[in-house]
Each structure stands twice: as structure tokens, then as C-alpha cells.
Amino acid sequence: IGKRIFFENAGGALTLKSVVETSSKFAAIPDNQGRANTASKALMEIIQEAKKDAANLFGATTGQFFVGESGTELLFRLVRNAATSAKAGGNIVGSSFEHPATRSAAKYWAAQTGRQYMNVQHENNNGNVTAQLYSEIVNRDTRLVTILHASPVTGISVDLQAISKAVHSIAPEALIIVDGVQYAAHGGIKIDHYKIDGYAISPYKMYSRHGYGFAWVSDRLTQMSHEQLLDGPIESWELGTRDTGSYATISDVVKYLEWLGGKIENSESRSVKLSNAAKAIAAQEIALTDLMIHGEDNIKGLKDLKGIEIIGGQKNPDRKGLVSFRINGTSSHLLVDFLNEKGIRTHVRKADHYSGNILNPLGWEDCVRVSVCHYNSSEEIKSLLLALNEFQVDASIGQVNSN
């Protein structure tokens, strides 16, 4: 690979070294859980400890955590079980803001359960969806609502607590399932504040690895009929043997964030350290995206480069470590290839089944996505801006084919 500047964090964050070591260690252990031996007992204790760690990370004092194939698979499962367990009739509500993980699942299970799917149209100008917009669509017959916490295309996060409150003010019994895949690495999660029924992430986007998804589910949804092994514990959401290594890597993530928060303030409190880490991460990412958009000194930011249009606008307080833009009249593929040659990793989002819901209303065929995490630096952002300036100079003298 060689030296590179990594601005593809929305496609997968950098992996903690401890996660690599933990995964290797547990892959070599043949023992299974639920056996009468010390190794099996140790595995069970590691899983339970990871769930306690996750409760601290997610800010959840109720409900339970479980792993699955991926964040998308878990969202499908949560939506499916909510749709089939909710009171018959009514409707299911989602938004055009969402990733297809929840949008596809909600539409499919609306059809399968004979319900109307009702869409909340997001706002093009700020790349977001609000509580007010949800309240205009949700009605007293709404059985299930899906919400995306932050978009991997616009980079904008929603006020989840406000949306949940608006939904329940109209439909108190409505179940709420949240896609937290993009949001998880960029801000503190506070499940207890949201009054929701499911929240799923993809750990590879939160400093862990591919190969599993991680979800929280409410006690309310657990008490409803859901998929489980016959005659098994009624509260269980786990199907088959659990991957202890997956759970253990969640603990690695929590330990890292504790360490980071401890650098901000010398505290013995885990919750204080995790909160400080979340605040520091948010502050660093705001500084990076502001620098990217506005530039510094004689280095032009995105807003001052010719022909550049930014999804969500130049000033958006809800931006979470991600800026998507295009140079009007220039292929985004061409620009990403140019940046690759400079050792700068970005990504093209096309108007396909993943991003068309955002790009098509704008009349865009594609865009360039630059996604940062707290470990990125201002010097890396400046390198990106200098490369973009160089691209525009080359294009102006005909050294870059803009078609």
C-alpha cells in the first residue's frame, strides 16, 4: 500500500492493533461456551464483560446486546421482528435520508405484513431530516419507525432524541429501530435518552474489524414475539454459538476510548472518560471538516475552489466527520483517481441503490466523499486542499481531462 492519507473512514475506520491481536488469539481457541471446564467458563465471562463494556459505551442501563453477521443484517433482523411482532395493521414510517439497510428492510416488511410504507422526505439543502418532518408523516396508526442516526453520504447527523419524542407524542406504542453504523465512531451514544427499541452498528467502522455486527435491543421488543430457538430462553436474541472474539474486540474499543478520555482528564470514572473521549473526538472532527471547507491562510478551502458544491452546505452544525462534494462539470471518478495518485484515499459515491436517494434529488450523478476520524490531522487536510488546488490548475491548462 505504501504511505497514504486515509480519508475513507466511512468505508471502515482504522483497526486497533489490540483488535488484531485479540481476534488472532480467540481464533486459535477451540473450546466452546456452555461446557463444564475452565476454558468454557472463561469464554462466558469474557462475553459477559464485553456486554457490560458495551452498556457503558452505548449509555444503556436496560436492554441487551448481541452480535450478528453485519450491521446491515442486524438491522434487517430488528426491523423484521418489530414488523411481525407489532400490532396488526397500521403503517411503517422511514425516510429518504436512510441507508438501504433500514429503508430496504422497512419497505420489504411493510409489504409482507400488509402495511403501507410512508416516506419522510429529507431536506436537500441541509442533507438532513428533522423531528418536524417525521411528525408530519407519523400518525396514531404508525407501528414501526426507522431512523438513520448519521448519513454516510451527507455526513449529517439527526437529533435522534427529538425525533423519537415527536414520534411517541403521536404514536406512543410505535417501535423505533435506529441505524447507528455511520454515527458510532463520531459521537457519544446515549441509548437511555432516546427511548428506542433497537440500535445497530458495524464495528469495523468503529476501530474494530469486519466479520460481525453489534446491536442493542430494548426489553420491550425482547418481550414481544421474536425469532429464537424453540424452547430456549425467551429473552435470547443470539442464534447459535457466539464468537467470543467479536465480543472481546468490543471491549478493546471501549478500553481505547477510556484511554483517550483519560488523556483529556485524569478521572477514575469510566463514564467520565468515555464522555470526554466522545467530546474530544467531536471537537477534532469539527476542526478538521471546518478546515477542509474554509481553508487556512493562503490554502483555499473547498468553498473557495471553483465549481465545488458541498452536500449539506458550507456551515452545518450537524456534520459528523464527513464532507461530500463535486466539482460541477468534472467526473468525481477522475478526481478520486487523481487523489489516489497523490496517496490520498477518498471515495466516489454514485447515484446507485446506496446513494441515489441523496444524489438523485440534487441532480448529481456522483460525488467525492472525504471522511475523517479523530486520528486524522490538520496537515493531512492541508495536503488534500493543496492537491485539489493542483487538480484545478492542471484542469485549467488542459492537463486533466474533465469529461
Task: Set out the residue ranges of the language-model regions.
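Pyridoxal 5′-phosphate
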Residues: 1-403
